Every structure is written in structure tokens, then in C-alpha cells.
UniProtKB/Swiss-Prot annotation:
It comes from Arabidopsis thaliana (Mouse-ear cress). It is found in: Nucleus; Chromosome. It holds the Pfam family SMC_N. Expressed in seedlings, rosette leaves and floral buds. Residues 23-1049 form the Zinc-hook domain. This is Structural maintenance of chromosomes protein 6A.
Amino acid sequence: MDEHGDHRQSNPFNDQQTSSGKILRIRLENFMCHSNLEIEFGDWVNFITGQNGSGKSAILTALCVAFGCRARGTQRAATLKDFIKTGCSYALVYVELKNQGEDAFKPEIYGDTLIIERRISDSTSLTVLKDHQGRKISSRKEELRELVEHYNIDVENPCVIMSQDKSREFLHSGNDKDKFKFFYKATLLQQVDDILQSIGTKLNSANALLDEMEKTIKPIEKEINELLEKIKNMEHVEEITQQVLHLKKKLAWSWVYDVDRQLKEQNEKIVKFKERVPTCQNKIDRKLGEVESLRVSLTEKKAQVACLIDESTAMKRELECLRQSMKKAAREKIALEEEYHHKCSNIQKIKDRVRRLERQIEDINEMTIRSTQVEQSEIEGKLNQLTVEVEKAESLVSSLKEEENMVMEKASAGGKEKEHIEEMIRDHEKKQRNMNAHINDLKKHQTNKVTAFGGDKVINLLRAIERHHRRFKMPPIGPIGAHVTLINGNRWASAVEQALGNLLNAFIVTDHKDLVALRDCGKEAKYNNLKIIIYDFSRPRLDIPRHMIPQTEHPTILSVLHSENTTVLNVLVDVSCVERHVLAENYEVGKIIAFERRLSHLKDVFTIDGYRMFSRGPVQTTLPPRPRRPTRLCASFDDQIKDLEIEASREQSEIQECRGQKREAEMNLEGLESTMRRLKKQRTQLEKDLTRKELEMQDLKNSVASETKASPTSSVNELHLEIMKFQKEIEEKESLLEKLQDSLKEAELKANELKASYENLYESAKGEIEALEKAEDELKEKEDELHSAETEKNHYEDIMKDKVLPEIKQAETIYKELEMKRQESNKKASIICPESEIKALGPWDGPTPLQLSAQINKINHRLKRENENYSESIDDLRIMHGEKEQKIGKKRKTYKSCREKLKVCKDAVDSRWNKLQRNKDLLKRELTWQFNHHLGKKGISGNIRVSYEDKTLSIEVKMPQDATNSAVRDTRGLSGGERSFSTLCFTLALQNMTEAPIRAMDEFDVFMDAVSRKISLDTLIDFALKQGSQWMFITPHDISMVKSHEKIKKQQMAAPRS
């Protein structure tokens, strides 16, 4: 029993907490004993306590009044004006409800809060519904009733609001029928039962009345049915007689019209056949024009390819010549730059020497005046020392310059090496990307071989063909590459694929209609430029005579190909001449086969390494290999994927190695630049020291000269002469320097021009190489197009000769025979009746003469049988039928409509009645489970027996301290506390079976002792918190033992005034 009770407690509907429909606050003005009372309620459990007479019960009464209850329904007054406080003229009940969540009542109108305001005066009572802003929305009773039904707030249901009168009534009642009435009303079963019984009674009465009314028209309906049967039969006999006459005339002319139909069909056939002649001839002429145009274009393209090959060879030689000239010009420019810098350095040294001589002249003049014997002696010593230091400094400067030049050359070489390594890295990365792309393509082809011959577009095309397969006379074959394999492994795969090219992507159809259908499928699959070949699928495998094949020991493409489809091999022979394409091992062998042996019936030679060679008259052509791509005709792509993965891994290793070399070169370059900066700094410092010491030495020399009493004027003159000599040398060197600078500019200009010419020529050569490859592809396409056009032209010529013209001749012969037959049939039919009578009968429906003959015989037999049965006049029968039908027609229509409506109502009542019976049984079981579950909290067990037939509800309670183990069947035999607790358990069991956003209980703990009240309160609170509705408990007793909880709100009413 407890298991079922726990199961009910954990019902997710009961556990769902919703804020919609709960009371936020109530305000009473001049209502019963309250002048102005306002109470705010919590969303969960609310306790209202106070002394007797404090107006606790008036709150429940006010709620009942606000929700539309009549005064007598509250059991507190006879009329609503009795609720007005003595001495006042009106009473006001103001209730504020939450209106939030999914169950909100018209939230777009009322908002989050809904207000019910009922004002009662001596003469009137008005209920107003307001929105969350206090604006009046409605004052209609229907709106309030809709609100109450929406939230299921039935204040007369004791499970929603149990007043103190109802509590005492149940406690004092020992009658099982009264308990049943309480249960039946609380679960709303009473209301549903009464409504269904009332409807059932009314339906039975209506059915009985309708049956009586329908019986009154039964005799007349029987007479009408008999008349209708007679009229119908008589009309049918007349129709049959007239039909026989018309059929005989039609039969006579049907022979004529049948021949006319045959003549028309034959004439349409002749016209259709003749329409084919210009169409077919136009196709032949158009294909013939295409063939001639393609032949001219093919000859021009071959000449263009040969010219492009010669031009590309000459371009390569010119490129190499320009590259050598560019290198030579660069070397000359570098040599001139070095010479220019060297001469600039010499001129600067001479200028420095001149400046020193000028300072020396000035110093001599000064020294002459102030020199002494002692100073001259010291100057000589210093002069010797400075001479040694200058020589040493000059030696160090020279060695540092040489070392700096060496480091600079190494740094320049290191920079060029770094650029070369970066270029290598870019080349390897590009190769690796291409290899990875090829690997991905091969893996895709390995999963589905068809994708190798058109990619995803061919898959979409095949699906479109499957969807529209009914449009094709024969299913298309393709792509061709998916239907062929190589016999000797993958050895010749690259050469065969180079020879067949885009032909491997082509599809084959049997006629022009299938070609149009396949093009439509291609457009749907977004497969543009789809190559389609028309070929007769019924044609057997072509038998090629041996003398028509090149006589060589080397294989042809046809000999290395295999296909299960004969049509595919025939197309390869007719379109691509695979029996005339010879395969060779390498360039040398291919050259011997193509140009030296002069084999008959040889068209092209293809080598494994990619060369194509052919001879057309005296012109010998060799096309270079194209960039290698993964072959698509391999039996297995594993080897290619493995080889490409090894090459990609090798390229990755090369990239890593080059990156290591780059890092090493960068480190070396940084070291050289650091060394160069250090050497330059040391050299600059030494040059400064050298200049300073040379000046000091010159000063000392001047001092020595004055000591030897040399003529200062003579020394100064000599120095002036030396300065003039140096200045003249400077002028000569600067003149030479200007000439050298002009030569340097010319060399630089020449180097730049050569470089630009090389780059332009390289770009031009690149374009010509690409143009050569493009021209080769176009040449192959032109050859394929020419062969395809010739095949289609021959196909249309065969159709014209073997099909179109013979069909026209045969159809004309048949037409002449039918014209003679028509003349004979027309002559015979005119004897029976003129053709105008047949036309007057209406349009010809087209039956054959045999069909008409059989129809006439069958109708004659039936007409004979019908004439034997009836002798009345059909007009009299129709008059009698019209009179009787008019008499009862309106009644019958009315009765039928009523019967249909009653049936719909009866079905609905039966469905609801069955559902009510099922719900009764479920509610009875659940009541017992819940009751026993709640009793168990006090150690009591019990049982409830409900009899819907006897309309009784009996309660059995078994006390744990009862040694007799007997159950108490009358609650009046229990103590006051036990009776109140059992009543509470019964009420909670009913509460758990009903829905309502608010519930209230007044003086539920009457007659309870302290222990029973404690258990009852705990039970009530646990139930209320789990159940999820808003609860209001009103009691005059102390509730201090109620545990504190955030969801429990306690309020104390003020004591009544004495």
C-alpha cells in the first residue's frame, strides 16, 4: 500500500511548481467583522491563527464570494448583503492573483497579475476583473466563470476550500452514504455523472420521438419505391429501342469511318516519315560541314604546334645567351665599383696629405720664433718614437682593411647562399603540396573508381540517369574509363591514358533521342561539356583484319585493353583508332617505330615516358611529355599512393634539411656581420690614432729643421711646391674618377637592361611553353571531335538509306489500298441511310464494327425480355410518383438530419461514460492507497471501501495498540484526536487526486490532542510542500511546533474587540 502511495507522491504533475493562479494578497473592506483587512500570502504554505471571533473564517468566506460563490453556498449568510458590516453601506473584496507561466489566463490582456474585485451593496453586487495595472478589463460573469474553470478553483469543492462547517459535518458523520457523497463531490464524479445521465435521458427521449415520427411515412415510402422501380424499367425499355435503331445506322457507317481512321493514321505516318527526310538531311549536311571545318582547323593546329616547338627551342637558346651576358655585365659592374672606391680613397689620402703640409707650414713659422736648443733635442727623441708608432699603426690599419674585405666577401656569399636555400624550400614545398593533392585524388578514386573519370559530377550524373531511366531507349554506357582495364598490369597505364585522354570520360548512347535525354541529365547534375558518342549497341564486336593493323612486335593500345562490354571496345576502335596506336618503351624505340620503319596503318606512337610521335606525309612531329599525373586505369592505386607518399616524405625530409641549412646560414651570416662591425670599429679608431700621430711627427720634423738652422723660408717654399704638386695630382685623379663614374653608370645601365631583357624573355618563354601545351591539348581535342563528327555523319547517312526512305515508300502503298476500300464501304452505307443522319445523332464515339454488332445482338435479347413484363403508361406512373414524393420529401430530409445529429451526440456520451467508469475504478484504488499511506505516519493502518452501486464509502481503521487486532469501521468509535487525524488522512488522499492552484482548510485540527496535532501538522506541511499548490491553514490553536521553513508563512490575526 505504501509503495502505491509513494508512487503517487512522486507524480511529476504534482511535483510541478507553477506560480499561475496563486493568491498574492486579499483586502477586505466592511466585510463581515473586518473594516479594513489586508493579508499577503506566500506561494506555498500559509498559517492563519487567532482567537475565536478574530475573523479567520471570514477570509475563506471572502475568497468564496470573490470567485463567484452564492451566499447560501458559503453557509454563512442567506444573501450577499448580509456580509456587509453592520453600519456600513457597502462591502469590498479585493483579490490579487499571480498570472505567470505556461498556464497563465490570457496573459496578453491581464499581464503578470490579475485582480478580482467584488463590491457588494444593499441592492447590487458587481464583480470586476482588472489587469496588472489596475485597469478594468471585464465585468461579465462569463469572464469570471471562464477564469474559475481555467484554474479549476471550485470553491464549493471541499478539496479546494474546506470550511469549518464542512470539517465538523464530516467528523460527526458516521453514515457511509454521507462519506460517499463527500468523496463523490470532492472528486467531481458527482458533477460528471449527473451531466451524463441528464444528457442520456434527453437523447433517449429524442430518439423515441424521432422513431414515432419516422414510422408515419413508412407506407408512403414503400409505394414510392415500387413506382420508381416501374418507371425506371419503362424508361430503360424506351431507351433500348431507340438505341438499337441508332446502332444499326452507326454500324453501316462504322465500316466507312473505320477506313477513314486508318487513312488518317496512315497519312499522319507518311507526313511524319517525310518530315524526317529534311531533318535527317540537315543533320547530315551539318555534320559534313563540321567535318570539313574540323579538318581545316586540325591542319592549322598541327602547323601551329610544329611552329611552337621550333619557337620554344630557339627561345631556350636565346635565354641561355642572355643569362651569360647578364652574368658578364654584373662582373664588369662589380670590378668598376671596386676601382671607383679605390681611386676615391687615394684622392682622399692626397687631400689629407695636403692639409697636413699646410698645417706644417704654419707650424714651421711658429717654431722658428720660439724653438730652443733643449726643445729641439726633445723633439728629435719624440720624432723617432712617433715614426715607429706610425709605421706600426699603418701596418695594423692595412691588415684590418684586408680582413674586413674578406669578411665582407664571405657575408655577401652567405646572403646569396641563404636566398638559394629559401628558393629550394619553396620548390620542395610546392612539390609536396602537389603530391598530397594527387594522393587525395587517388584515395578518392580507390574508394569509387568511377570518380576517377569526372569526379563528383559523374556520380551526380549517374544518379540523374537512374532517376530518369524511363526516358532512355537503352541505358547509357559510361564513363568509358570505368568499363576498361589493362591486361598486363600497370606497365602501359600512362601511355594509354595519354593516348585516350578525355575519351575515358565520355558516355555512349544508342540514338539521338537518348543523347538529348543524357544532356538534360547532365544539366541537372551540373556536368557541363559532357562528351557523348552515338553508337549502335546491337553491333557485334568488330573483327579487324590482320593486314589493317601495324605489323610490329610492339603492342597496340587495343591489345593491352580489356572490357566486358563489346560496345565500349567498338567505340574505342571507331572513335580513337586504338588498333593503330603503337606503344613503345622509350623515346629511342618510339622514334625508330614512328620515323624509320615506315609502317603502314600506323597512326601514332606513345612512349612510357610521355612522348607522342606521328608522321603525316613528309612532316615528322614529336610532342614532348606533359607533366606526369597519376594514372586512372590502374587495377589498384595502392602502389601509386605508396610511391607518392614515399616521395612526399622524401620532400618533407628535404624541406627539414634545407630549413636546418637555412638556420645555419643565418647564424653564420649574423656572426660575419658582427665580426665586420667589430673590425670596422677597430679600423676607424686606428685611423684616427694614425692621423693624430702623423700630425705630431710632422710637427716634430719641423722643429728639427729649425734646429739645423735651415732657412725657414726655404723649407716653406719646398712645402708649397709639394702642395702644388699634390693638388695637380688630385685634379688629374678626379678627372679620371669622373670618367670611371661614367663607365660605372654605363655598366650598371647595361646590367639592368640585360636583366630586364632576360626577365621579359623568360616570361615570354613561359607563355609560349604554356601555349604549346595548350595547343597540344587542343590538337588532341580537334582529332577527337573530327572522328566523332565523321561517326555521327555516317550514322545519319545509314538511317536515311536503310530506314527513312523505305518506310515512306511502304506507307504510300498502304494508303492507296485503303482509299479503294473506302470507296466500296461508302457505297454500301449510303444504301442504308444518308451520312447526314449519322452526323445529326452527334459526334462519332469511335467503336469498331465488330463492337457495334455484338452490342446490337445483346440489346435485342434484353429488349425482348423487358417488353414481356410491363403494360402500364409511363406518364401515369410519373404523375403518381411526383405527388407522393412531394408529400413526404421535406419530412424525410428533416428526420434524417435529426438522426445524424442524435447519433453524434450518443457516440460522444458513450465515450465519456466509458471513460467515467474507468476513472471511477482508478480513483477508488488510489484513494485507498493514499489513505493508508498517510495513516502509516502515525503507525495506523486502514482501508477504504467504495461501492458505486450502493453509493457507500466505508472507512476501516486499525489501531496499533489494539490487542484484538480488530478494525474500527465507525469513526465515531475513535477518540477525538484519532477521528480528526483519520479525517485529515482521508482529506489528503482526496487532495492528491484533484488539481487546484490554491487550497484552504479551516479548523482542520479540531478535537486533536497535542500529539495528534503535531503529527497532523507535519503530515500536512510535507504534503503541501510536495504537492506544489498554495495552501491556507486556519486554526485557533498554537502552531509554535510547526517547523520553520522558507516556504512556510505564519500570520496572527488581531484579537477581537470586546
